Swiss-Prot record:
<dbReference type="InterPro" id="IPR006196">
    <property type="entry name" value="RNA-binding_domain_S1_IF1"/>
</dbReference>
<dbReference type="InterPro" id="IPR004368">
    <property type="entry name" value="TIF_IF1"/>
</dbReference>
<keyword id="KW-0396">Initiation factor</keyword>
<comment type="similarity">
    <text>Belongs to the IF-1 family.</text>
</comment>
<dbReference type="GO" id="GO:0019843">
    <property type="term" value="F:rRNA binding"/>
</dbReference>
<dbReference type="GO" id="GO:0043022">
    <property type="term" value="F:ribosome binding"/>
</dbReference>
<dbReference type="GO" id="GO:0005829">
    <property type="term" value="C:cytosol"/>
</dbReference>
<comment type="subunit">
    <text>Component of the 30S ribosomal translation pre-initiation complex which assembles on the 30S ribosome in the order IF-2 and IF-3, IF-1 and N-formylmethionyl-tRNA(fMet); mRNA recruitment can occur at any time during PIC assembly.</text>
</comment>
<comment type="function">
    <text>One of the essential components for the initiation of protein synthesis. Stabilizes the binding of IF-2 and IF-3 on the 30S subunit to which N-formylmethionyl-tRNA(fMet) subsequently binds. Helps modulate mRNA selection, yielding the 30S pre-initiation complex (PIC). Upon addition of the 50S ribosomal subunit IF-1, IF-2 and IF-3 are released leaving the mature 70S translation initiation complex.</text>
</comment>
<dbReference type="GO" id="GO:0003743">
    <property type="term" value="F:translation initiation factor activity"/>
</dbReference>
<dbReference type="Pfam" id="PF01176">
    <property type="entry name" value="eIF-1a"/>
</dbReference>
<keyword id="KW-0694">RNA-binding</keyword>
<keyword id="KW-0699">rRNA-binding</keyword>
<feature type="domain" description="S1-like">
    <location>
        <begin position="1"/>
        <end position="72"/>
    </location>
</feature>
<protein>
    <recommendedName>
        <fullName>Translation initiation factor IF-1 2</fullName>
    </recommendedName>
</protein>
<keyword id="KW-0648">Protein biosynthesis</keyword>
<dbReference type="InterPro" id="IPR012340">
    <property type="entry name" value="NA-bd_OB-fold"/>
</dbReference>
């Protein structure tokens, strides 16, 4: 899938789940499950509850997301 097909949104991490999955509340109020992107995993970027993150959603499944950026 091309990167142009993704939807980028801001959200806040609510809680950590097993196997590097997170529950994320988006700015529009929806709660989705998200996993860390490969580059973030490769550079050992840690994500904790309360962190502001940028996620990518696909138009095919709006209940799952990929975390691509953690705000400082």
């Amino acid at each position: 899938m091309a990167k142009e097909d993704t939807i980028q949104m801001q959200g806040e991490v609510l809680e950590n789940l097993p196997s590097a999955t997170f529950k994320i509340k988006l700015e529009n109020g929806h709660v989705v499950l998200g996993h860390i992107s490969g580059k973030m995993r490769m550079h050992y970027i840690r994500i904790l509850p309360g962190d502001k993150v940028t996620v990518e959603l696909t138009p095919y499944d709006l209940s799952r997301a990929r975390i691509v950026f953690r705000a400082k």
